[in-house]
Amino acid sequence: MTYLIKGETATWEVVVGLEVHAQVVSQSKLFSGSSTRFGAPANSQVSLVDAAMPGMLPVINGLCVEQAVRTGLGLRAKINKRSIFARKNYFYADLPQGYQISQYEQPIVGEGKVVLDMPDGSSREVGIERLHLEQDAGKSMHDQHPTKSLIDLNRSGVALMEIVSKPDMREPEEAGAYLRKLRSIMRYLGTCDGNMEEGSMRADVNVSVRPIGTTDLRTRCEIKNVNSVRFVMQAIEAEAHRQVEVWESGGEVRQETRLFDPAKGETRSMRSKEHAHDYRYFPDPDLLPLEFDDAFVEKVRRSLPELPDDKKNRFIADFGLTPYDASVLVVDRENAAFFEKVAEGRDGKTAANWVINNLFGALAKAGKGVADSPVSAENLGKLLDLLKDEVINGRIAKDVFEIMMETGEDPDAIVEDKGLRQVTDTSAIEAAVDAVIAANPEKADDVRGGKEKLLGWFVGQVMKATQGKANPAMLNDILRAKLLG
């Protein structure tokens, strides 16, 4: 899949890089002991450090450091055993210190990579430039008072990982796949919950365009704080088309920060884009360099779970799944665990088909996740056993599954209570076939005359007469014997 924009003077390709701000899973903030609980009353989780009271000194949260290293290892990135915190100087009402504690020249994590699973089954690689730790700012609220803006400092000082990609993406779909994969990895690791709707994962989107076939990077614009995968993809498309129009009309794209308006489907200028020197970075004199040894990194490495790519490869090898099915199943750790329970001792492909197409489809329709599924992995496995043992046929299995989604009942009990066992008595099926043929002599003659497509119609009628319980293979054999000899 290639995303190109045709213009009057050239065909343009899009160049995209993402800066993802991921809130670290930790009960306390990066440099203070204040809680990070979401949804608490305004200014109820603010320490003297968070409010930048004079004389208050930051103390590093060791868990946040470990979480950053875990994430770096999950991204197959270089871990820098010595990094430095720096002050990023700028003024804003919700930044009480007048600077943000971040990392600049020496981040905690260096280059890595993320492998994307695309919808067409292909894989693509996106480079990671760096990951650094920094503190979040507070929140300005403009809708709480008719004439004043208010400040909530609950978020001030919360630990963030800023994960900066290389400009390796060439289409909106790749950016979407990158965000989904990054979120999946961090959820497996337990380092970020990835809830974009709560602001715990936000993306700054860097977009530029260039004529196809050229290699120079043109001026980019940054779209700030986009809070959903869908909006990121829409923002890239809108901004790319805007830039193409500017270049095609003889103008020049200015380096600036922009905002995306989802309602209008367009980006608008926010301010001219700052350069690094505008922030006057310098090492924070209140914090020593962050140093750890190889033993610490290895200890963290040994604690890593099986990650999505490794799990996907195992599912392909152990269960014979297609790369696409395996990638769908491993997006969420809970989904993968559910599938493994269903597939244990059973045909992996059949289990994957039922989990992906039947269960996931029904749950999406009901607005639920696997954790809230009324159908347990054990009961779905029992349903597949009934199907394999030919106690029920495929059509009845779907009916039983619908009842299970509504009630959560055991499939064995449903089949017995409702008398849904498959009819495998040859004489009973023959009687039903004879009755349908006798009632439709003209159609029977048409089949004998060569219109074999009508056999499907007869199958449907017999199934209707037996309430869907006739064994399909036996039914087909009997029909063919009686109508085609």
Curated annotation (Swiss-Prot):
SUPFAM superfamilies: GatB/YqeY motif (SSF89095), Glutamine synthetase/guanido kinase (SSF55931). Gene3D superfamilies: 1.10.10.410, GatB domain, N-terminal subdomain. InterPro entries: Asn/Gln-tRNA_amidoTrfase_suB/E, Asn/Gln-tRNA_Trfase_suB/E_cat, Asn/Gln_amidotransferase, Asn/Gln_tRNA_amidoTrase-B-like, GatB, GatB_C_1, GatB_Yqey_C_2, Gln-tRNA_amidoTrfase_suB_CS. Pfam families: GatB_N, GatB_Yqey. The keyword Ligase applies. It catalyses: L-glutamyl-tRNA(Gln) + L-glutamine + ATP + H2O = L-glutaminyl-tRNA(Gln) + L-glutamate + ADP + phosphate + H(+); L-aspartyl-tRNA(Asn) + L-glutamine + ATP + H2O = L-asparaginyl-tRNA(Asn) + L-glutamate + ADP + phosphate + 2 H(+). GO terms for molecular function: asparaginyl-tRNA synthase (glutamine-hydrolyzing) activity; ATP binding; glutaminyl-tRNA synthase (glutamine-hydrolyzing) activity. Allows the formation of correctly charged Asn-tRNA(Asn) or Gln-tRNA(Gln) through the transamidation of misacylated Asp-tRNA(Asn) or Glu-tRNA(Gln) in organisms which lack either or both of asparaginyl-tRNA or glutaminyl-tRNA synthetases. The reaction takes place in the presence of glutamine and ATP through an activated phospho-Asp-tRNA(Asn) or phospho-Glu-tRNA(Gln). This is Aspartyl/glutamyl-tRNA(Asn/Gln) amidotransferase subunit B. Belongs to the GatB/GatE family. GatB subfamily. Its EC number is 6.3.5.-. It is an enzyme of class 6 (ligase). Keywords: ATP-binding, Ligase, Nucleotide-binding, Protein biosynthesis. One of its GO terms (biological process) is glutaminyl-tRNAGln biosynthesis via transamidation. NCBIfam families: gatB, PRK05477.1-2, PRK05477.1-4, PRK05477.1-5. Heterotrimer of A, B and C subunits.
